[in-house]
């Protein structure tokens, strides 16, 4: 029984590791905000080397009350931030989270973050896979 349980656990771990290894996160950064700012934004490039789409559904960070997926776009001549339930990273493709496009919005920072600080994130995908990311706080990209 113990051997079967161990085999099952190793098999499950290998599936998670395989799913996680098809996604790469590059150039993760958080824009430094003015003192007493109640909202911050994060950017990064998500690269999917897998044969199927990867769907980002949730992001968490201990540095913020919560993290939201957003997309900036112009609607009827007015720039707006639109909440996204998910961000699809196509198979063998990439999505850049950048100013004026997809990005992470983070309200309620736990403390003031300044250039040189680092912020930890956990990205969760629709298949249950997670990826840990550490982003640098910068004044400019």
Regions found by a protein language model. Give the residues of each.
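Compact, glycine-rich, soluble single-domain proteins
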Residues: 20-141
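Positively charged n-region of N-terminal signal peptides that target proteins for export
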Residues: 1-4
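N-terminal signal peptide c-region/cleavage motif recognized by signal peptidases
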Residues: 12-18
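Sec-dependent N-terminal signal peptides
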Residues: 6-9
């Amino acid at each position: 029984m113990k051997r079967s349980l161990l085999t099952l656990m190793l098999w499950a771990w290998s599936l998670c590791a395989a799913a996680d290894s098809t996604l790469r996160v590059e150039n993760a950064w958080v824009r430094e905000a003015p003192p007493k700012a109640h909202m911050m934004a994060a950017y990064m490039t998500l690269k999917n080397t897998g044969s199927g789409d990867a769907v980002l559904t949730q992001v968490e960070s201990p540095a913020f009350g919560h993290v939201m997926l957003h997309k900036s776009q112009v609607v009827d001549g007015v720039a707006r931030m639109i909440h996204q339930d998910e961000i699809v990273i196509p198979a063998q493709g990439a999505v850049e989270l950048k100013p004026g496009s997809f990005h992470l919005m983070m309200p309620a920072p736990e403390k003031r973050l300044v250039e040189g600080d680092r912020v930890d994130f956990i990205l969760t995908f629709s298949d249950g896979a997670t990826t840990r990311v550490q982003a640098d706080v910068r004044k400019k990209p």
